[in-house]
Amino acid sequence: MKHITQLLAAAAVSMAIALPAHAETTLTVHYPMPGFFKDVMDTISKKFMAENPDIKIQFASPSATYEEGIQTILRQVGTSEMPDITFIGLNRLRMLNERDVAVDLGPLVQKDGNMAEQGFSDTILKLAQVKGKQVGLAFATSNPIMYYNADLVKAAGGDPENPPKTWDEVIALGGKIKALGNGVDGIDFRWQGDDWMFSALLFGAGGKMLSDDESKVAFNGPEGQKAVEVLHRLVTEGGMPVFTKAAGEQAFAAGKVGFEFQTTGALRNTIKNVGNKFDLRTAKIPLINPANGHLPTGGNAVVILTHDAAKQDAAWKFAKFAAGPYGASVVVPGTGYVPNNELAAKSADYLGDFYKQNPLFQAGLSQMPEMIPWYAFPGSNGVKVTQTIVDNLSRIVDQSAEPKEALDDAAADVEDMLPRS
Protein backbone atom coordinates (compact mmCIF):
# COMPACT_ATOMS: atom_id res chain seq x y z
CA MET A 1 0.00 0.00 0.00
CA LYS A 2 2.80 2.34 0.89
CA HIS A 3 4.47 1.55 -2.44
CA ILE A 4 1.25 2.32 -4.36
CA THR A 5 0.86 5.60 -2.49
CA GLN A 6 4.39 6.58 -3.43
CA LEU A 7 3.74 5.75 -7.09
CA LEU A 8 0.55 7.80 -7.11
CA ALA A 9 2.35 10.72 -5.49
CA ALA A 10 5.15 10.50 -8.05
CA ALA A 11 2.62 10.38 -10.87
CA ALA A 12 0.85 13.43 -9.50
CA VAL A 13 4.12 15.36 -9.38
CA SER A 14 4.95 14.22 -12.92
CA MET A 15 1.58 15.39 -14.21
CA ALA A 16 1.96 18.73 -12.45
CA ILE A 17 5.27 19.24 -14.19
CA ALA A 18 4.00 18.09 -17.57
CA LEU A 19 0.87 20.24 -17.61
CA PRO A 20 1.48 23.99 -17.89
CA ALA A 21 -0.39 26.27 -15.54
CA HIS A 22 -1.50 28.34 -18.56
CA ALA A 23 -1.50 28.21 -22.33
CA GLU A 24 1.84 29.27 -23.78
CA THR A 25 2.43 31.17 -27.03
CA THR A 26 5.87 30.72 -28.56
CA LEU A 27 7.31 33.48 -30.75
CA THR A 28 10.30 32.96 -33.02
CA VAL A 29 12.37 36.13 -33.31
CA HIS A 30 15.06 36.95 -35.87
CA TYR A 31 17.59 39.79 -35.53
CA PRO A 32 20.81 40.97 -37.24
CA MET A 33 24.33 41.79 -36.07
CA PRO A 34 24.71 39.56 -32.99
CA GLY A 35 27.94 41.35 -32.09
CA PHE A 36 25.82 44.39 -31.30
CA PHE A 37 22.54 42.84 -30.30
CA LYS A 38 22.90 39.34 -28.82
CA ASP A 39 23.31 40.50 -25.22
CA VAL A 40 20.65 43.15 -25.77
CA MET A 41 18.15 40.62 -27.11
CA ASP A 42 18.89 38.13 -24.35
CA THR A 43 18.35 40.76 -21.67
CA ILE A 44 15.14 42.13 -23.18
CA SER A 45 13.62 38.70 -23.84
CA LYS A 46 14.33 37.42 -20.32
CA LYS A 47 12.71 40.48 -18.76
CA PHE A 48 9.74 40.22 -21.12
CA MET A 49 9.16 36.52 -20.38
CA ALA A 50 9.37 37.19 -16.65
CA GLU A 51 6.58 39.75 -17.00
CA ASN A 52 4.62 37.68 -19.54
CA PRO A 53 4.92 34.02 -18.43
CA ASP A 54 2.37 32.92 -21.04
CA ILE A 55 4.69 33.98 -23.89
CA LYS A 56 7.95 32.26 -24.77
CA ILE A 57 10.61 33.93 -26.94
CA GLN A 58 12.94 31.74 -28.98
CA PHE A 59 15.54 33.11 -31.40
CA ALA A 60 16.21 32.09 -34.97
CA SER A 61 19.84 32.15 -36.13
CA PRO A 62 20.84 35.83 -36.31
CA SER A 63 22.13 37.41 -39.54
CA ALA A 64 25.55 39.03 -39.70
CA THR A 65 24.33 42.25 -41.35
CA TYR A 66 21.16 44.15 -42.20
CA GLU A 67 21.55 43.14 -45.85
CA GLU A 68 21.85 39.44 -44.97
CA GLY A 69 18.88 39.85 -42.67
CA ILE A 70 16.52 41.18 -45.33
CA GLN A 71 17.66 38.54 -47.82
CA THR A 72 17.05 35.79 -45.25
CA ILE A 73 13.52 36.98 -44.55
CA LEU A 74 12.66 37.32 -48.24
CA ARG A 75 13.86 33.76 -48.87
CA GLN A 76 11.75 32.43 -45.99
CA VAL A 77 8.47 34.10 -46.98
CA GLY A 78 5.76 31.48 -47.30
CA THR A 79 7.81 28.76 -45.62
CA SER A 80 7.71 27.28 -42.13
CA GLU A 81 11.12 28.84 -41.48
CA MET A 82 9.84 32.42 -41.54
CA PRO A 83 9.99 33.88 -38.01
CA ASP A 84 7.08 35.59 -36.29
CA ILE A 85 9.10 38.76 -35.67
CA THR A 86 12.19 40.25 -37.27
CA PHE A 87 14.38 43.28 -36.71
CA ILE A 88 15.11 44.92 -40.09
CA GLY A 89 17.30 47.86 -41.14
CA LEU A 90 15.23 51.01 -41.41
CA ASN A 91 16.25 51.54 -45.03
CA ARG A 92 14.98 48.07 -45.94
CA LEU A 93 11.46 48.39 -44.51
CA ARG A 94 10.31 49.49 -47.93
CA MET A 95 11.35 46.17 -49.44
CA LEU A 96 9.17 44.29 -46.96
CA ASN A 97 6.28 46.63 -47.58
CA GLU A 98 6.49 46.50 -51.38
CA ARG A 99 6.38 42.71 -51.19
CA ASP A 100 3.51 42.80 -48.67
CA VAL A 101 5.47 40.74 -46.15
CA ALA A 102 5.13 42.84 -42.99
CA VAL A 103 1.94 43.09 -40.94
CA ASP A 104 0.42 46.59 -40.99
CA LEU A 105 0.72 47.81 -37.41
CA GLY A 106 -1.60 50.77 -38.00
CA PRO A 107 -4.73 48.99 -36.68
CA LEU A 108 -2.80 47.80 -33.61
CA VAL A 109 -1.57 51.35 -32.94
CA GLN A 110 -5.12 52.68 -33.26
CA LYS A 111 -6.55 49.94 -31.06
CA ASP A 112 -3.88 50.60 -28.43
CA GLY A 113 -4.96 54.22 -28.22
CA ASN A 114 -2.26 55.52 -25.87
CA MET A 115 1.01 55.11 -27.75
CA ALA A 116 2.16 58.65 -26.91
CA GLU A 117 1.78 57.90 -23.20
CA GLN A 118 4.12 54.93 -23.70
CA GLY A 119 6.76 57.18 -25.27
CA PHE A 120 5.87 56.56 -28.92
CA SER A 121 5.34 60.07 -30.27
CA ASP A 122 4.23 60.66 -33.86
CA THR A 123 7.84 61.55 -34.71
CA ILE A 124 9.07 58.22 -33.35
CA LEU A 125 6.31 56.25 -35.06
CA LYS A 126 7.10 57.83 -38.44
CA LEU A 127 10.65 56.45 -38.33
CA ALA A 128 9.26 53.00 -39.18
CA GLN A 129 6.53 54.07 -41.60
CA VAL A 130 6.53 53.59 -45.37
CA LYS A 131 4.23 56.02 -47.18
CA GLY A 132 2.15 56.41 -44.04
CA LYS A 133 1.90 52.68 -43.33
CA GLN A 134 3.20 51.55 -39.93
CA VAL A 135 5.51 48.73 -41.04
CA GLY A 136 7.34 48.44 -37.71
CA LEU A 137 8.42 50.19 -34.52
CA ALA A 138 11.86 51.78 -34.46
CA PHE A 139 14.09 49.74 -32.13
CA ALA A 140 17.71 50.88 -32.30
CA THR A 141 18.09 54.30 -33.87
CA SER A 142 21.06 56.53 -34.59
CA ASN A 143 21.90 59.87 -36.13
CA PRO A 144 25.22 61.32 -37.30
CA ILE A 145 27.17 63.42 -34.81
CA MET A 146 30.45 65.30 -34.49
CA TYR A 147 33.26 63.60 -32.56
CA TYR A 148 36.24 65.81 -31.80
CA ASN A 149 39.67 65.70 -30.22
CA ALA A 150 39.58 68.54 -27.69
CA ASP A 151 43.37 68.50 -27.35
CA LEU A 152 43.89 69.13 -31.07
CA VAL A 153 41.13 71.73 -31.17
CA LYS A 154 42.83 73.63 -28.36
CA ALA A 155 46.28 73.28 -29.94
CA ALA A 156 44.91 74.80 -33.16
CA GLY A 157 43.49 77.82 -31.33
CA GLY A 158 39.91 76.61 -30.98
CA ASP A 159 37.75 76.47 -27.87
CA PRO A 160 36.83 72.88 -26.90
CA GLU A 161 33.97 74.21 -24.78
CA ASN A 162 32.43 75.85 -27.86
CA PRO A 163 32.88 73.50 -30.83
CA PRO A 164 32.06 74.62 -34.39
CA LYS A 165 28.37 75.05 -35.15
CA THR A 166 28.60 75.57 -38.92
CA TRP A 167 30.41 73.76 -41.70
CA ASP A 168 32.41 76.91 -42.42
CA GLU A 169 33.69 76.85 -38.83
CA VAL A 170 34.45 73.12 -39.03
CA ILE A 171 36.40 73.53 -42.26
CA ALA A 172 38.38 76.51 -40.98
CA LEU A 173 39.36 74.76 -37.74
CA GLY A 174 40.06 71.50 -39.56
CA GLY A 175 42.53 73.33 -41.78
CA LYS A 176 44.28 74.77 -38.73
CA ILE A 177 44.53 71.31 -37.16
CA LYS A 178 46.00 69.93 -40.38
CA ALA A 179 48.57 72.76 -40.29
CA LEU A 180 49.82 71.51 -36.90
CA GLY A 181 51.81 68.88 -38.83
CA ASN A 182 53.21 65.72 -37.24
CA GLY A 183 51.00 63.54 -39.42
CA VAL A 184 47.79 65.05 -38.06
CA ASP A 185 44.73 65.42 -40.31
CA GLY A 186 41.86 67.81 -39.81
CA ILE A 187 38.72 65.85 -40.58
CA ASP A 188 37.28 62.38 -41.21
CA PHE A 189 33.78 62.18 -42.71
CA ARG A 190 32.33 58.68 -43.15
CA TRP A 191 31.08 58.95 -46.74
CA GLN A 192 31.99 55.36 -47.66
CA GLY A 193 29.78 52.29 -47.89
CA ASP A 194 26.32 53.80 -48.28
CA ASP A 195 24.47 57.07 -48.86
CA TRP A 196 23.73 57.76 -45.19
CA MET A 197 26.28 60.51 -44.55
CA PHE A 198 25.58 62.09 -47.94
CA SER A 199 21.96 62.14 -46.76
CA ALA A 200 23.11 64.00 -43.65
CA LEU A 201 24.47 66.80 -45.85
CA LEU A 202 21.57 66.70 -48.33
CA PHE A 203 18.79 66.52 -45.73
CA GLY A 204 20.69 69.04 -43.62
CA ALA A 205 20.40 71.46 -46.54
CA GLY A 206 16.66 70.81 -46.76
CA GLY A 207 16.97 68.58 -49.82
CA LYS A 208 15.57 65.21 -50.80
CA MET A 209 16.65 62.24 -52.90
CA LEU A 210 13.77 62.06 -55.39
CA SER A 211 10.77 64.13 -56.45
CA ASP A 212 7.59 63.69 -54.44
CA ASP A 213 6.21 61.21 -56.98
CA GLU A 214 9.59 59.42 -57.03
CA SER A 215 9.80 59.62 -60.80
CA LYS A 216 12.81 61.94 -61.01
CA VAL A 217 16.09 62.48 -59.19
CA ALA A 218 16.11 65.51 -56.89
CA PHE A 219 19.43 65.11 -55.08
CA ASN A 220 21.27 67.12 -57.75
CA GLY A 221 19.20 70.24 -57.08
CA PRO A 222 20.50 73.33 -55.25
CA GLU A 223 20.55 71.53 -51.89
CA GLY A 224 22.54 68.63 -53.31
CA GLN A 225 25.00 71.03 -54.91
CA LYS A 226 25.56 72.64 -51.52
CA ALA A 227 26.03 69.20 -49.95
CA VAL A 228 28.76 68.06 -52.33
CA GLU A 229 30.44 71.46 -52.15
CA VAL A 230 30.82 70.97 -48.39
CA LEU A 231 32.30 67.51 -48.99
CA HIS A 232 34.72 69.01 -51.53
CA ARG A 233 35.78 71.74 -49.11
CA LEU A 234 36.35 69.23 -46.30
CA VAL A 235 39.10 67.84 -48.53
CA THR A 236 40.54 70.98 -50.12
CA GLU A 237 40.32 73.31 -47.11
CA GLY A 238 39.59 71.18 -44.03
CA GLY A 239 42.45 68.70 -44.19
CA MET A 240 40.47 65.52 -44.92
CA PRO A 241 42.49 62.73 -46.60
CA VAL A 242 41.15 59.79 -48.61
CA PHE A 243 40.46 57.41 -45.72
CA THR A 244 38.77 54.05 -45.81
CA LYS A 245 36.09 53.78 -43.13
CA ALA A 246 38.30 51.62 -40.90
CA ALA A 247 41.41 53.74 -41.45
CA GLY A 248 39.55 56.92 -40.56
CA GLU A 249 38.19 55.43 -37.34
CA GLN A 250 41.62 54.11 -36.38
CA ALA A 251 43.34 57.42 -37.10
CA PHE A 252 40.81 59.34 -35.02
CA ALA A 253 41.08 56.90 -32.11
CA ALA A 254 44.88 57.22 -32.28
CA GLY A 255 44.65 60.99 -31.83
CA LYS A 256 45.68 61.80 -35.41
CA VAL A 257 42.44 63.46 -36.59
CA GLY A 258 40.70 66.54 -35.21
CA PHE A 259 37.07 65.87 -36.18
CA GLU A 260 35.17 62.72 -37.07
CA PHE A 261 31.65 62.73 -38.46
CA GLN A 262 29.75 59.46 -38.26
CA THR A 263 26.97 57.58 -36.48
CA THR A 264 26.34 57.97 -32.78
CA GLY A 265 25.99 54.19 -32.83
CA ALA A 266 29.79 54.00 -32.88
CA LEU A 267 30.12 56.00 -29.67
CA ARG A 268 30.62 53.16 -27.16
CA ASN A 269 33.32 51.57 -29.33
CA THR A 270 34.97 54.95 -29.93
CA ILE A 271 35.13 55.63 -26.19
CA LYS A 272 36.72 52.22 -25.71
CA ASN A 273 39.23 52.67 -28.54
CA VAL A 274 40.26 56.19 -27.52
CA GLY A 275 40.74 55.27 -23.87
CA ASN A 276 42.89 57.92 -22.20
CA LYS A 277 44.83 58.95 -25.31
CA PHE A 278 43.07 62.31 -25.57
CA ASP A 279 40.08 64.35 -24.39
CA LEU A 280 37.19 62.99 -26.47
CA ARG A 281 34.14 65.20 -26.94
CA THR A 282 30.94 65.05 -29.00
CA ALA A 283 28.63 67.71 -30.40
CA LYS A 284 25.76 68.16 -32.82
CA ILE A 285 26.58 67.87 -36.51
CA PRO A 286 26.14 71.16 -38.41
CA LEU A 287 23.17 71.59 -40.73
CA ILE A 288 23.69 73.49 -43.97
CA ASN A 289 20.21 74.96 -43.49
CA PRO A 290 19.49 75.06 -39.74
CA ALA A 291 15.94 76.32 -40.29
CA ASN A 292 14.79 73.53 -42.62
CA GLY A 293 17.46 70.85 -42.23
CA HIS A 294 16.97 67.29 -41.02
CA LEU A 295 19.10 64.21 -40.34
CA PRO A 296 18.74 60.62 -41.58
CA THR A 297 17.90 57.96 -39.04
CA GLY A 298 20.03 54.82 -39.01
CA GLY A 299 19.28 51.61 -37.16
CA ASN A 300 16.53 49.01 -37.29
CA ALA A 301 12.88 48.39 -36.49
CA VAL A 302 10.94 45.49 -35.02
CA VAL A 303 8.52 44.06 -37.60
CA ILE A 304 5.71 41.55 -37.12
CA LEU A 305 5.49 38.86 -39.80
CA THR A 306 3.03 36.34 -38.34
CA HIS A 307 -0.60 36.47 -39.47
CA ASP A 308 -1.75 34.08 -36.74
CA ALA A 309 -4.23 36.08 -34.62
CA ALA A 310 -3.12 34.66 -31.26
CA LYS A 311 0.53 35.13 -32.11
CA GLN A 312 -0.06 38.67 -33.34
CA ASP A 313 -1.35 39.73 -29.93
CA ALA A 314 1.75 38.29 -28.27
CA ALA A 315 4.02 39.72 -30.96
CA TRP A 316 2.55 43.20 -30.48
CA LYS A 317 3.25 42.97 -26.75
CA PHE A 318 6.86 42.00 -27.43
CA ALA A 319 7.34 44.64 -30.13
CA LYS A 320 6.16 47.41 -27.80
CA PHE A 321 8.27 46.06 -24.96
CA ALA A 322 11.44 45.82 -27.05
CA ALA A 323 10.95 49.25 -28.62
CA GLY A 324 9.62 50.75 -25.41
CA PRO A 325 11.35 52.45 -22.48
CA TYR A 326 12.83 49.27 -20.99
CA GLY A 327 14.24 48.13 -24.32
CA ALA A 328 15.76 51.55 -24.92
CA SER A 329 17.33 51.48 -21.46
CA VAL A 330 19.16 48.30 -22.50
CA VAL A 331 20.15 49.34 -26.03
CA VAL A 332 21.46 52.86 -25.42
CA PRO A 333 24.15 52.35 -22.74
CA GLY A 334 25.64 49.35 -24.49
CA THR A 335 25.93 50.85 -27.96
CA GLY A 336 25.53 54.58 -28.39
CA TYR A 337 22.25 54.38 -30.28
CA VAL A 338 19.78 57.10 -29.33
CA PRO A 339 16.56 56.12 -27.57
CA ASN A 340 13.64 55.49 -29.89
CA ASN A 341 11.28 56.15 -27.02
CA GLU A 342 10.73 59.59 -25.51
CA LEU A 343 9.61 58.23 -22.13
CA ALA A 344 12.91 56.39 -21.78
CA ALA A 345 14.90 59.51 -22.62
CA LYS A 346 13.16 61.70 -20.06
CA SER A 347 12.47 59.37 -17.14
CA ALA A 348 14.98 58.83 -14.34
CA ASP A 349 13.59 55.29 -14.12
CA TYR A 350 15.20 54.53 -17.47
CA LEU A 351 17.76 56.85 -19.13
CA GLY A 352 17.30 60.26 -17.54
CA ASP A 353 20.20 59.82 -15.12
CA PHE A 354 22.30 58.01 -17.72
CA TYR A 355 22.52 61.09 -19.90
CA LYS A 356 23.36 63.29 -16.93
CA GLN A 357 26.21 60.96 -16.02
CA ASN A 358 27.40 60.34 -19.61
CA PRO A 359 27.53 63.69 -21.43
CA LEU A 360 29.16 62.23 -24.55
CA PHE A 361 25.83 60.58 -25.35
CA GLN A 362 23.88 63.85 -25.23
CA ALA A 363 24.75 65.01 -28.77
CA GLY A 364 22.74 62.28 -30.46
CA LEU A 365 19.87 62.68 -27.98
CA SER A 366 19.66 66.42 -28.64
CA GLN A 367 19.27 65.80 -32.38
CA MET A 368 16.22 63.55 -32.10
CA PRO A 369 13.82 66.33 -33.21
CA GLU A 370 15.75 66.62 -36.50
CA MET A 371 15.55 62.89 -37.32
CA ILE A 372 13.62 61.74 -40.40
CA PRO A 373 13.60 58.32 -42.11
CA TRP A 374 16.67 57.16 -44.02
CA TYR A 375 15.40 57.26 -47.59
CA ALA A 376 14.93 53.95 -49.39
CA PHE A 377 14.89 54.06 -53.18
CA PRO A 378 11.96 52.37 -54.95
CA GLY A 379 12.22 49.31 -57.13
CA SER A 380 14.72 46.49 -57.37
CA ASN A 381 17.84 48.58 -57.98
CA GLY A 382 18.19 50.09 -54.51
CA VAL A 383 21.61 48.56 -53.83
CA LYS A 384 22.93 49.65 -57.24
CA VAL A 385 21.61 53.17 -56.73
CA THR A 386 23.37 53.46 -53.39
CA GLN A 387 26.66 52.21 -54.84
CA THR A 388 26.40 54.67 -57.73
CA ILE A 389 26.11 57.56 -55.30
CA VAL A 390 29.05 56.29 -53.23
CA ASP A 391 31.22 55.82 -56.32
CA ASN A 392 30.67 59.43 -57.32
CA LEU A 393 31.29 60.71 -53.80
CA SER A 394 34.63 58.92 -54.05
CA ARG A 395 35.47 60.96 -57.15
CA ILE A 396 34.88 64.15 -55.16
CA VAL A 397 37.00 63.04 -52.22
CA ASP A 398 39.92 61.87 -54.36
CA GLN A 399 39.52 65.04 -56.47
CA SER A 400 39.24 63.18 -59.77
CA ALA A 401 36.03 65.08 -60.55
CA GLU A 402 34.52 68.45 -59.68
CA PRO A 403 31.59 68.28 -57.24
CA LYS A 404 28.94 69.33 -59.78
CA GLU A 405 30.25 66.91 -62.40
CA ALA A 406 30.21 63.95 -60.02
CA LEU A 407 26.75 64.80 -58.68
CA ASP A 408 25.26 65.23 -62.15
CA ASP A 409 26.82 61.93 -63.27
CA ALA A 410 25.32 60.17 -60.25
CA ALA A 411 21.92 61.74 -60.95
CA ALA A 412 21.94 60.67 -64.60
CA ASP A 413 22.86 57.08 -63.74
CA VAL A 414 20.32 56.84 -60.92
CA GLU A 415 17.59 58.28 -63.16
CA ASP A 416 18.09 55.31 -65.50
CA MET A 417 17.73 52.87 -62.60
CA LEU A 418 14.39 54.15 -61.31
CA PRO A 419 11.33 51.96 -61.95
CA ARG A 420 9.07 53.07 -64.78
CA SER A 421 5.31 53.01 -64.33
Pin down the residues of each PLM region:
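Periplasmic solute-binding protein
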Residues: 93-101, 106, 123-162, 190-213, ...
